[in-house]
Protein backbone atom coordinates (compact mmCIF):
# COMPACT_ATOMS: atom_id res chain seq x y z
CA UNK A 1 0.00 0.00 0.00
CA UNK A 2 3.07 2.24 -0.22
CA UNK A 3 1.82 4.03 -3.33
CA UNK A 4 -1.55 4.98 -1.84
CA UNK A 5 0.23 6.56 1.11
CA UNK A 6 2.75 8.42 -1.01
CA UNK A 7 0.38 9.48 -3.77
CA UNK A 8 -2.43 10.59 -1.65
CA UNK A 9 0.58 12.61 -1.36
CA UNK A 10 9.87 20.98 -3.83
CA UNK A 11 11.40 23.36 -5.68
CA UNK A 12 12.13 26.65 -3.89
CA UNK A 13 11.61 29.94 -5.71
CA UNK A 14 14.93 31.49 -6.67
CA UNK A 15 15.67 35.16 -6.67
CA UNK A 16 13.40 37.89 -5.35
CA UNK A 17 10.07 36.66 -4.02
CA UNK A 18 7.10 38.08 -2.15
CA UNK A 19 5.58 36.09 0.72
CA UNK A 20 1.85 36.16 1.44
CA UNK A 21 0.41 35.13 4.81
CA UNK A 22 -3.22 36.05 4.01
CA UNK A 23 -4.95 32.68 3.83
CA UNK A 24 -7.81 33.99 1.68
CA UNK A 25 -5.39 35.45 -0.87
CA UNK A 26 -3.44 32.19 -0.94
CA UNK A 27 -6.61 30.14 -1.46
CA UNK A 28 -7.68 32.43 -4.30
CA UNK A 29 -4.25 32.19 -5.96
CA UNK A 30 -4.09 28.39 -5.65
CA UNK A 31 -7.67 27.94 -6.82
CA UNK A 32 -6.99 30.07 -9.87
CA UNK A 33 -3.98 27.98 -10.86
CA UNK A 34 -5.75 24.66 -10.29
CA UNK A 35 -8.82 25.77 -12.23
CA UNK A 36 -6.68 26.22 -15.34
CA UNK A 37 -6.37 22.44 -15.71
CA UNK A 38 -9.62 20.53 -16.17
CA UNK A 39 -7.46 17.67 -17.43
CA UNK A 40 -3.75 17.07 -16.99
CA UNK A 41 -1.20 14.52 -18.12
CA UNK A 42 2.44 14.36 -17.07
CA UNK A 43 5.43 12.15 -16.53
CA UNK A 44 6.71 12.07 -12.96
CA UNK A 45 9.70 11.05 -10.89
CA UNK A 46 9.18 10.28 -7.20
CA UNK A 47 11.78 10.10 -4.44
CA UNK A 48 11.08 9.11 -0.83
CA UNK A 49 13.61 9.98 1.90
CA UNK A 50 13.60 9.14 5.59
CA UNK A 51 14.10 11.74 8.30
CA UNK A 52 17.90 11.56 7.98
CA UNK A 53 17.83 12.03 4.20
CA UNK A 54 18.47 8.39 3.29
CA UNK A 55 16.80 7.26 0.08
CA UNK A 56 14.02 4.77 0.68
CA UNK A 57 12.54 4.47 -2.81
CA UNK A 58 12.83 6.06 -6.24
CA UNK A 59 10.22 5.53 -8.96
CA UNK A 60 8.92 7.09 -12.18
CA UNK A 61 5.80 6.87 -14.29
CA UNK A 62 2.83 8.55 -15.96
CA UNK A 63 -0.03 10.54 -14.44
CA UNK A 64 -3.44 11.45 -15.91
CA UNK A 65 -6.07 13.58 -14.13
CA UNK A 66 -9.57 14.72 -14.98
CA UNK A 67 -11.65 16.97 -12.81
CA UNK A 68 -13.54 16.15 -10.65
CA UNK A 69 -11.85 13.28 -8.86
CA UNK A 70 -10.57 11.07 -11.68
CA UNK A 71 -6.93 10.06 -11.78
CA UNK A 72 -4.62 7.37 -13.10
CA UNK A 73 -1.12 6.91 -11.68
CA UNK A 74 1.07 4.30 -13.38
CA UNK A 75 4.43 3.53 -11.81
CA UNK A 76 6.94 1.98 -14.18
CA UNK A 77 8.77 -1.34 -13.64
CA UNK A 78 10.63 -2.67 -11.72
CA UNK A 79 8.19 -1.48 -9.02
CA UNK A 80 5.20 -1.44 -11.33
CA UNK A 81 1.86 -0.46 -9.86
CA UNK A 82 -1.33 1.07 -11.22
CA UNK A 83 -3.54 3.36 -9.16
CA UNK A 84 -6.89 4.42 -10.65
CA UNK A 85 -9.85 6.41 -9.32
CA UNK A 86 -13.22 6.96 -10.97
CA UNK A 87 -14.11 9.59 -8.39
CA UNK A 88 -15.86 7.14 -6.07
CA UNK A 89 -13.46 4.26 -5.53
CA UNK A 90 -9.79 3.47 -5.98
CA UNK A 91 -8.12 0.42 -7.51
CA UNK A 92 -4.51 -0.38 -6.63
CA UNK A 93 -3.17 -3.08 -8.94
CA UNK A 94 0.16 -4.82 -8.37
CA UNK A 95 0.91 -7.06 -11.38
CA UNK A 96 3.87 -8.74 -9.65
CA UNK A 97 1.66 -9.86 -6.77
CA UNK A 98 -1.29 -10.51 -9.11
CA UNK A 99 -3.43 -8.57 -6.65
CA UNK A 100 -5.82 -5.62 -6.78
CA UNK A 101 -7.03 -3.71 -3.72
CA UNK A 102 -10.31 -1.79 -4.00
CA UNK A 103 -11.15 1.04 -1.61
CA UNK A 104 -13.70 3.80 -1.35
CA UNK A 105 -12.07 7.10 -2.28
CA UNK A 106 -11.59 9.30 0.77
CA UNK A 107 -12.77 12.71 -0.45
CA UNK A 108 -10.97 14.58 2.33
CA UNK A 109 -8.16 16.56 0.78
CA UNK A 110 -6.02 15.99 3.86
CA UNK A 111 -6.18 12.23 3.25
CA UNK A 112 -5.76 12.33 -0.51
CA UNK A 113 -3.42 15.11 -1.69
CA UNK A 114 -3.93 14.01 -5.29
CA UNK A 115 -7.42 15.52 -5.03
CA UNK A 116 -5.79 18.94 -4.89
CA UNK A 117 -5.09 18.44 -8.58
CA UNK A 118 -8.19 16.49 -9.57
CA UNK A 119 -10.90 16.99 -6.95
CA UNK A 120 -13.24 19.60 -5.50
CA UNK A 121 -10.97 22.57 -4.97
CA UNK A 122 -13.76 24.52 -3.25
CA UNK A 123 -12.87 22.49 -0.14
CA UNK A 124 -9.28 23.74 0.03
CA UNK A 125 -9.95 26.46 2.59
CA UNK A 126 -11.87 23.97 4.76
CA UNK A 127 -8.93 21.58 4.88
CA UNK A 128 -5.78 23.71 4.94
CA UNK A 129 -4.11 26.82 6.24
CA UNK A 130 -2.20 28.11 3.20
CA UNK A 131 0.65 30.52 2.60
CA UNK A 132 2.50 31.23 -0.61
CA UNK A 133 5.34 33.16 -2.15
CA UNK A 134 5.80 34.27 -5.70
CA UNK A 135 8.85 35.28 -7.68
CA UNK A 136 9.17 35.53 -11.46
CA UNK A 137 7.24 32.65 -13.02
CA UNK A 138 7.35 30.50 -9.85
CA UNK A 139 4.58 30.23 -7.25
CA UNK A 140 5.22 28.09 -4.15
CA UNK A 141 2.46 27.09 -1.72
CA UNK A 142 2.74 25.60 1.77
CA UNK A 143 -0.38 23.80 3.00
CA UNK A 144 -0.86 22.83 6.64
CA UNK A 145 -3.80 20.52 7.48
CA UNK A 146 -6.29 21.99 9.94
CA UNK A 147 -6.95 18.59 11.52
CA UNK A 148 -4.57 16.03 13.00
CA UNK A 149 -6.08 12.99 11.27
CA UNK A 150 -3.88 13.34 8.19
CA UNK A 151 -1.23 11.45 6.24
CA UNK A 152 1.16 14.41 6.34
CA UNK A 153 2.09 17.44 8.40
CA UNK A 154 3.09 19.69 5.50
CA UNK A 155 2.34 19.69 1.79
CA UNK A 156 4.33 21.88 -0.59
CA UNK A 157 3.03 22.51 -4.09
CA UNK A 158 4.89 24.52 -6.73
CA UNK A 159 3.89 25.94 -10.10
CA UNK A 160 6.09 27.25 -12.90
CA UNK A 161 4.64 29.33 -15.73
CA UNK A 162 1.13 28.36 -14.63
CA UNK A 163 1.75 24.59 -14.63
CA UNK A 164 2.20 22.29 -11.65
CA UNK A 165 5.90 21.53 -11.28
CA UNK A 166 6.39 19.55 -8.08
CA UNK A 167 4.84 18.37 -4.84
CA UNK A 168 6.44 17.48 -1.53
CA UNK A 169 4.76 15.71 1.39
CA UNK A 170 6.35 15.63 4.85
CA UNK A 171 4.95 13.34 7.54
CA UNK A 172 5.16 13.43 11.33
CA UNK A 173 8.49 11.57 11.53
CA UNK A 174 10.19 13.69 8.89
CA UNK A 175 9.83 11.29 5.96
CA UNK A 176 9.65 13.23 2.70
CA UNK A 177 8.11 12.24 -0.59
CA UNK A 178 9.19 14.48 -3.47
CA UNK A 179 7.33 14.28 -6.78
CA UNK A 180 8.59 16.16 -9.86
CA UNK A 181 6.24 16.54 -12.83
CA UNK A 182 7.45 17.09 -16.39
CA UNK A 183 6.04 16.98 -19.94
CA UNK A 184 2.92 18.51 -18.37
CA UNK A 185 -0.04 18.95 -20.74
CA UNK A 186 -3.32 20.57 -19.74
CA UNK A 187 -6.88 20.51 -21.07
CA UNK A 188 -6.39 17.83 -23.71
CA UNK A 189 -9.16 15.30 -24.37
CA UNK A 190 -8.76 12.14 -22.26
CA UNK A 191 -10.47 8.79 -22.79
CA UNK A 192 -12.78 8.11 -19.82
CA UNK A 193 -11.91 4.40 -20.05
CA UNK A 194 -8.48 5.02 -18.53
CA UNK A 195 -10.19 5.95 -15.25
CA UNK A 196 -11.83 2.55 -14.79
CA UNK A 197 -10.27 -0.84 -14.09
CA UNK A 198 -11.26 -4.30 -15.28
CA UNK A 199 -9.80 -6.97 -13.01
CA UNK A 200 -7.68 -9.40 -15.05
CA UNK A 201 -8.53 -13.12 -14.81
CA UNK A 202 -6.78 -14.93 -11.98
CA UNK A 203 -6.00 -11.77 -9.99
CA UNK A 204 -6.78 -11.76 -6.26
CA UNK A 205 -9.25 -9.05 -5.20
CA UNK A 206 -9.09 -7.40 -1.77
CA UNK A 207 -12.01 -5.17 -0.75
CA UNK A 208 -11.30 -2.61 1.97
UniProtKB/Swiss-Prot annotation:
Its main location: periplasm. One of its GO terms (biological process) is lipoprotein transport. InterPro entries: LolA/LolB/LppX, OM_lipoprot_carrier_LolA-like, OM_lipoprot_carrier_LolA_Pbac. It comes from Pseudomonas paraeruginosa (strain DSM 24068 / PA7). Keywords: Chaperone, Periplasm, Protein transport, Signal, Transport. NCBIfam families: lolA. Belongs to the LolA family. This is Outer-membrane lipoprotein carrier protein. Monomer. Participates in the translocation of lipoproteins from the inner membrane to the outer membrane. Only forms a complex with a lipoprotein if the residue after the N-terminal Cys is not an aspartate (The Asp acts as a targeting signal to indicate that the lipoprotein should stay in the inner membrane). One of its GO terms (cellular component) is outer membrane-bounded periplasmic space. Residues 1-21 form the signal peptide. It is found in: Periplasm. The keyword Signal applies.
Amino acid sequence: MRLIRTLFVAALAMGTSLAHADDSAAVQRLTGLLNKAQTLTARFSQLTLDGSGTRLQETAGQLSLKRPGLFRWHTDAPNEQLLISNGEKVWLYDPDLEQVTIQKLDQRLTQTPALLLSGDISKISESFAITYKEGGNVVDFVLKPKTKDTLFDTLRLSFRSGKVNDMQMIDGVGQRTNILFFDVKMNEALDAKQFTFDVPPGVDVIQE
